[in-house]
Amino acid sequence: MRTVRTLLIDNYDSFTYNLFQMLAEVNGAAPLVVRNDDTRTWQALAPGDFDNVVVSPGPGHPATDTDLGLSRRVITEWDLPLLGVCLGHQALCLLAGAAVVHAPEPFHGRTSDIRHDGQGLFANIPSPLTVVRYHSLTVRQLPADLRATAHTADGQLMAVAHRHLPRFGVQFHPESISSEHGHRMLANFRDLSLRAAGHRPPHTERIPAPAPAPAPAPAPAPPASAPVGEYRLHVREVACVPDADAAFTALFADAPARFWLDSSRVEPGLARFTFLGAPAGPLGEQITYDVADRAVRVKDGSGGETRRPGTLFDHLEHELAARALPATGLPFEFNLGYVGYLGYETKADSGGEDAHRGELPDGAFMFADRMLALDHEQGRAWLLALSSTRRPATAPAAERWLTDAARTLATTAPRPPFTLLPDDQLPALDVHYRHSLPRYRELVEECRRLITDGETYEVCLTNMLRVPGRIDPLTAYRALRTVSPAPYAAYLQFPGATVLSSSPERFLRIGADGWAESKPIKGTRPRGAGPAQDAAVKASLAAAEKDRSENLMIVDLVRNDLGQVCDIGSVHVPGLFEVETYATVHQLVSTVRGRLAADVSRPRAVRAAFPGGSMTGAPKVRTMQFIDRLEKGPRGVYSGALGYFALSGAADLSIVIRTIVATEEAATIGVGGAVVALSDPDDEVREMLLKAQTTLAALRQAHAGATASDRELLAGSLR
């Protein structure tokens, strides 16, 4: 069959690239995506360039010019076959003379069974059909030229077709991971478009289906003829596996910056390795980034500092390409490289706005040239150091460090487990909330109003807690990893600030082989008092419609983000709505994977997905604007990403949640939750406080000034 050329108008939605991927599979060619305000590209296009048009979903109302943009022109000026999805469907109907009004209830990330007429888009598709809906508005009073082709059981209009032209609209989202027969529907649209143009559609009844869920292959060993770069990796396996806590202090206590990427909760397939290191050798660097300045500052091992214009993403992309070093045959892919964080305000470089100024750098990384790696599964440990062929003295320096570090580890005694003090020995915390609890509740209500008006589907709202006074960060981290062990825990120490994280959520892992994986979390419940109650809580979470809708919205958003940078047909969801259990909570987790296109760098892939959708909501761009307005301040490190970019081409970053950021003046904590149409404001306040428990408990172990128990503190905060 010949390929079909589709123009896909993007109404700034976070699901457009799910349509992109499906259309590319069905059509045999990737569609051209044009944003609804990209008039320059639009002016260079003509109807003859395409076989059909798809108008994407999006936030807002189709009568609002800025919400619809070029979608209005393509609907009114072009006579090509057209499919409108959600907002596109509403626009098609409105411009034909229908009314668009509030639906009986907002319906986002939830499924419905619809009945259809079996014709046109619905040919050879069973009825009833299960579909996912994301809408607060609905179409009423269809004009004579449009006919209804699908409804829900309660009579809500779900699809239309023009009586004389190949024009169709669907209120639901055929591209959602939980909608049935989406590929068949788009294939039907392809065939209808070809017929309209006088072409014979394909005879085969076989419809391209989503790619199977292939297991990521192990990274291939580099060939003997692999190009030789500037850097050399020096590796030495140590005879004994040291205690991570003791080794961190013994090897890196004097480093100006240091990291502990800590699998404090070892999970097969999730967390096997712990990495401890620093920019402690002659090749080490410290990097800070300020969005407003749009420049990276690099401080080298000798203390010299340079300013390099451009974004942090640009800097990482350039330097990783220049410093590439193939994987070494070790069981892990982190063969040294960049370790640090991307603060939430870095969103200004990935589609968001530069709305707020924080006290700390918007991004901070260290180029680590010294490291200890621990394999918790095999019980092995390695020391790693870098040298440069351009600086011959760095090779013997690396070997000396390996020898000295191995000798140090051989005589380092394990540190005793951290002992948590009882409540009656702890002073009380002076917790300052950016938004009081009544005000936070009002913000939840405002989010629900925005959802009702169709401006957004889900808002991940945040509150910031500040505890004045200085703490010992390492003591607080030891308490945190004891209270709340997590697979993506981390301790990052930079001059002026230390990040202590017990994150359970993977933002994005990219293997050296190019396979990417994200594991968004949406849905949280406190653990039950006993085994029976705990099992009941877990089962309740797994079945809860509100939590599943939150999770599904973010899964579809992450699929969209990966769909921008991954091979056609490679994005898939091997795990949907799985409950993971932690020390204090159960959480609803899904897994999304895809294979990066060959020309996509790791920083570019991270940039496409940043900030993580589980910390913004959807649609991402519009919702971030509302977050800027509602929260009235920076999030800082919180809700950004933390982890490493390896010289091997691998990267692994967590979502910054369950995290303390400590400075000389105070410790700050970010907490919040996803607000959807089904949210109860009081429940959202309780969830926010629940998520603060572990970090506040750790602060109480390290901070001078606490008295009340965590339960009393939380109860008092609710009053």
Swiss-Prot record:
The keyword Transferase applies. Disruption phenotype: Disruption of the gene abolishes pristinamycin I biosynthesis. It catalyses: chorismate + L-glutamine = 4-amino-4-deoxychorismate + L-glutamate. GO terms for biological process: 4-aminobenzoate biosynthetic process; antibiotic biosynthetic process; folic acid-containing compound biosynthetic process; L-tryptophan biosynthetic process. Its EC number is 2.6.1.85. Pathway: Antibiotic biosynthesis. Residues 5-199 form the Glutamine amidotransferase type-1 domain. It is an enzyme of class 2 (transferase). Residues 199-224 are annotated as: Disordered. Residues 209-224 have a biased composition (Pro residues). It comes from the Bacteria. Involved in pristinamycin I biosynthesis. Catalyzes the biosynthesis of 4-amino-4-deoxychorismate (ADC) from chorismate and glutamine. In the C-terminal section; belongs to the anthranilate synthase component I family. This is Aminodeoxychorismate synthase.
